[in-house]
Curated annotation (Swiss-Prot):
One GO term of the biological process aspect: DNA replication-dependent chromatin assembly
Compartment(s): Nucleus; Chromosome
Function: Component of the FACT complex, a general chromatin factor that acts to reorganize nucleosomes. The FACT complex is involved in multiple processes that require DNA as a template such as mRNA elongation, DNA replication and DNA repair. During transcription elongation the FACT complex acts as a histone chaperone that both destabilizes and restores nucleosomal structure.
Keyword Transcription tagged: yes
Protein family per UniProt: Belongs to the SSRP1 family.
Additional notes on this entry: In contrast to the orthologous protein in animals and plants, this protein does not contain a HMG box DNA-binding domain. This function may instead be provided by the HMG box of the associated NHP6 protein in the FACT complex of fungi.
Main subcellular location: nucleus
Species assigned in the record: Yarrowia lipolytica (strain CLIB 122 / E 150)
Acidic residues bias locations: 204-219, 523-544
Superkingdom of origin: Eukaryota
Protein's name according to its UniProt entry: FACT complex subunit POB3
Keyword check for Cell membrane: no
Amino acid sequence: MSTTEFDGIYLNQSKAHGRLRMVETGLGWKAVQKTSMGGSKETKKDEPFLLGKEELLAAFWSRGSRGFEMKIQTKNRGAANFDGFEQDNLEELKNVMKRNYGISVEQREHSVKGWNWGKTDFERSELVFSVANKPAFEIPYAEVANSNLVGKNEVALEFQQPADGRAGDELVEMRFYVPGVTSVEGDENPKKKQKTEKEGEEGKEGDDDADADDESEEEVQSTAQIFYDTLKEKADIGAVAGTAVVSLSEIYLVIPRGRYDIDMYANFMRLRGKTYDYMVQYKHVQRLIVLPKPDDLHNILVVQLDPPLRQGQTRYPFLVMQFLREAEIKVELNVDDAEFAEKYADKGLKQSYDESAHQVVGSIFRGLTGRKLTVPGSFKTVHGHAGVSCSLKASEGHLYPLERNFLFLSKPVFIPFAEIQDITLSRVGSSVTTSRTFDMTLKLRNAQGEYQFSNISKEEQEGLEAFIKSKGIRLKNDLAEEKALLAATLAEVDDDSDDGGEFRGSADEDDESPDEDFHAESDSEVAEEFDSNAESSSGEEDDE
């Protein structure tokens, strides 16, 4: 059996190069790493990549990122890219592929024009974007985590994130602008198909009228919608092997807002909304928190995610579900008795539920994710609620002091006690004695900033102080200091008023008395000053 080997080959843009070995029964690739002596050795961490002869469909040769690459299309395992060949290896590869597997290696040229408009082709295992009939790039269906129709002419693709969680630059989303509309004809139109079946049962009467009706009932869809539907079908978005463990219908989410059907599988769940769909791996769930809203009508289930869900530039590190407190739901797990006993009985799950909605959903989430369900602790407001009404910047909501964390809703902000350096109670811009509210500032460690919660009722001050002190968090009470300073200032003013009263002028000293230097003038003098006819008047009197 002849063997052909190539060194320095990279599989699917891997960081580690390896050795490609080709024999008559198939081919295999194994990663290698450099040793301290400058040689190389096979790694134990990475398993070899093997392809049997029966899996190979086609092969293509083109330029790659590390020289030249050979892409192999398979029947069931997508496309495999082997990068790092020299140009001189082409003839040898052609001979080996033809002799061992009966496959011809086709040469392809990639488009390097840099245009961002072109045509898309849905091939067997990848989406190909072509410019001037040359492929510009390919997107393997396996790399598409989710897709959403944004508006009428835009389709967004979200890509799988690295499993190792490494930091660095990563392409997370791509959007395609797909203009125009398309008429759906023939069997593609479900309305026409149903009508045709009905006419077949009733006979062939009125065929001419039926044909006219069919032409008028052609459905017009946007090209973006057809692109989106085709991508979902090809990439199997939303389609998984097996049946959901449990399905929850019409669950109302405050964040992201809308009603979603939640299908929960063994290792992940899917949220299917009217516009957007999301997939959440259970390993990304960090916390589960169940809280009663102070309105005495609703309960909330908060699911903290890391990494967060993405929708364009918007991130959702929290899922917030809201339930009516009196609402009840009835669900059953889609597993038989044997499977339940083997996989789910030890996780605290039950085969059927008929309880309050928030209790059922919380219990199912706890069992499948393996996360502890956090509930309110010992803190209560003066009205017996678990949350204090306040504001964070422009957002109004409630601050929930939990046993190890603070949680602010409606826009979630999660603050562990371990990250808090100190807490300051203060009131800015108002008199301490007349103010009915105060502010609470949480300063974080390592200069991570601070959170200022304002407009907290003064009735809650005593309870919050006692809670903060019980958790061993450093507390600064500027309200007490300001009140003490104000009292001292008022005391000084009272002392000054008692000692200095005799030195102040009295209003009694300003009694009215005639001015001795003032002599009242006669009426004639007044007339001479203000009356222009004063002289003539006096003259007339003399004549008389």
